[in-house]
């Protein structure tokens, strides 16, 4: 019994630092507010970022896109669709038959499981638009680079 208690206590001590290393990110969709037919710009922030780092990267992207499009600082930004993320993965799927990604046809799914988040997004897109929609993935992203190799591998990497 004491061995079991020690084993559980040791495991809790090992896992606690892993859970403390939160990672943040954003999935942003920028659409030119002056021309809704303009191509969408999709941005994910870099992996393994703190909350402040990912927010700074998002703000730089939005401001840069606005500047390129000639949008003044007193006007509304084109970054209207922003998904904040913490310790998770995200996938964006869309119906290719509809002519491309639009803010109205994007299917966005979040999940801590990289291995399945893309399939869930595709399945939801197909459910919504049918096989004739020819659903496709636009992006799959995780806030932590360790998530790409799976949950068990992530835990092992953090323990090293």
Report residues per predicted region:
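Sec-dependent N-terminal signal peptides
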Residues: 2-16
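Secreted/extracellular ectodomain signature
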Residues: 21-160
